[in-house]
Amino acid sequence: ASDTLKSWNLLPTKPDWAQGLAKTWAPGEAGARELLATFLDDGLKGYAEGRDRPDQQHVSRLSAHLHWGEISPHHVWYATRNAMARAEGVLDRDGEKFLKEVLWREFAYHLLHHVPHFPDKPFKPEYEDFPWVVDSEALQKWQRGQTGYPIVDAGMRELWATGIMHN
């Protein structure tokens, strides 16, 4: 028999955290294209600096759509390039930074495909003897956004509430 979801003691169970997902997600290709268009119109300008600021919305939120194939990296690439061209240089720095992040994502997929041990072993052998700390209580606090580190906890709570974590 397998575990029940209730036995995992996930938080929060009340209120219904899935309500947040329903408010923030529009699954499918149409939702992905709409999200990309909104990002290119409203979020790309300022991306290079704002992507690392959780108090700003300069993130695309496209990761799940890319993961599930609801939009392709090629589509994102060309739509971003077109937005940059229309802006006549105004978005060049931000667009280039965003495209570099898309390329990093694709590079990671390339590594996962072509380096069979990548998910299970360190990429660099000198890290094989890294002294990992096994602490199930600390792991549970991290998973629930209860570490006591505000930026870490905010990120995990955002993930719980919206299904997305800021950059």
Where are the model-predicted features located?
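Glycine/tryptophan-enriched, flexible segments
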Residues: 1-122, 126
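Poly-acidic low-complexity segments
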Residues: 28, 72, 135-136, 149
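Residue-level signal for pocket-adjacent positions within structured domains
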Residues: 57, 61, 134-137, 159
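Short, functional "switch" segments adjacent to catalytic/cofactor/reactive centers
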Residues: 105, 121-146
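C-terminal substrate/ligand-recognition segments
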Residues: 109, 114, 137-167
